[in-house]
Design a protein with these regions (language model features):
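Carbohydrate-active catalytic/glycan-binding domains of CAZyme proteins
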Residues: 1-362
Length: 362
């Protein structure tokens, strides 16, 4: 329970947001998380908590908070959506988020500093004193105690994305109203993998509905944008545009993993017309000889490894596309009157269907 963390009761943040788990050099499993309140309130305020267990599937017990060698808790940058990897005995922790405040025209950035301070639980002085600002994903190494920072944190992608492959923008009104992002740059949901000596940094992009990735020969620098792995609205498949999304799109987090010699991407999509109810999904992916991962199309097969058998019955909620031709992007919004996956005390089902709704299984 998150309530084991003493900060949960003090701050009124009882939820573990976007956790990640790694095995320590002592053979135990460590769960890294950030505490959050309802609908993400306070989730940017840190610190990063850690729970520990002898087995990967629980039961985890509160262990401590990520800190510097002098014992002070780590609040540098934005402690959010942590990811961890045991890199041959070196424990690496990644975290962060990104908003385009630092790319605003002169004079505008200063106007939004109080908004940043409120969002991130910092003072304006703390924000302006951090070279390059507090935005972007960062990496640090931990001691074997899995709590104490040994080196870093250092930023691994440019905070100022202008003129880079990570260039991303947001309409000025969106700075207050919510997700009005454009581009494939980092937003949140960091994850890290090492494949064939290459580091894969997987993240939820500012477009919000897709997992993207960048690669490097190094764990903490020189990452190169490589592309989109999956979109929960199949945006980008066959040139499909945002307005042509095949599902209600919204936040997706996830990563890739090799299971029995085959690679898969794990992600989630929206149900019940809200960004705060999500269905876990998976698709097989291919890593090409050059290290690239072509974007995968959503299917109804998941981890089946082959087409579903043409007999028996399947849940309606495994449809890969559900659209009336005008599906919204959710961000933090909720919707009624659209086709959606839902449930009651008896079953899961599709609702909000109307003339012209497409329900696709493949």
């Amino acid at each position: 329970s998150a309530m084991q963390d003493p900060w949960a009761a003090v701050t009124g943040r009882p939820y573990l947001y976007a956790p990640d788990c790694g095995r320590g050099n002592d053979g135990r499993y460590y769960l890294y998380y950030c505490l959050s309140g309802d609908k993400g309130v306070g989730g940017y305020h840190g610190p990063i908590g850690v729970a520990v267990c002898d087995t990967p599937d629980g039961e985890y017990k509160f262990y401590g908070h990520v800190r510097f060698a002098d014992g002070t808790l780590c609040y540098r940058f934005v402690p959010f959506d942590p990811a961890v990897i045991n890199d041959g005995g070196v424990i690496r922790l990644y975290y962060g988020t990104w908003y385009p405040y630092d790319e605003l025209p002169p004079g505008e950035r200063e106007k939004y500093l109080p908004i940043q301070a409120q969002m991130f639980g910092k003072t304006v002085e703390e924000i302006v004193s951090e070279p390059g600002g507090v935005m972007g994903p960062v990496c640090c190494t931990l001691c074997d105690d899995m709590l104490t920072i040994k080196d870093g944190p250092v930023r691994i992608l440019p905070a100022d994305t202008r003129g880079t492959p990570f260039e991303s923008k947001m309409a000025e009104s969106g700075l207050v109203e919510g997700h009005k992002f454009y581009g494939h740059g980092f937003y949140e949901g960091a994850s890290i993998r090492k494949i064939g000596g290459i580091y894969y940094f997987i993240y939820s992009s500012v477009n919000n509905h897709e997992l993207c990735y960048a690669t490097s020969r190094y764990p903490d620098r020189e990452f190169r944008y490589r592309g989109v792995i999956v979109s929960n609205g199949d945006v980008g498949i066959a040139g499909r545009r945002e307005s042509e999304r095949l599902n209600h799109t919204g936040t997706t987090h996830g990563s890739i993993e090799c299971i029995n010699g085959r690679w898969y991407v794990f992600y989630h999509r929206q149900t019940h017309g809200t960004d705060y109810s999500r269905q876990a999904c998976a698709e097989p992916i291919v890593i090409l000889p050059d290290g690239s991962i072509p974007q995968v199309e959503i299917t109804s097969c998941g981890l089946n490894g082959a087409p579903l058998a043409g007999e028996g019955t399947y849940p309606a909620v495994i449809c890969c596309n559900l659209t009336d031709g005008h599906m919204p992007h959710g961000g933090n919004a909720s919707f009624t009157g659209i086709p959606m996956i839902s449930h009651d005390e008896h079953d899961r089902f599709l609702t909000g269907l109307k003339q012209g709704t497409s329900i696709v299984y493949k």
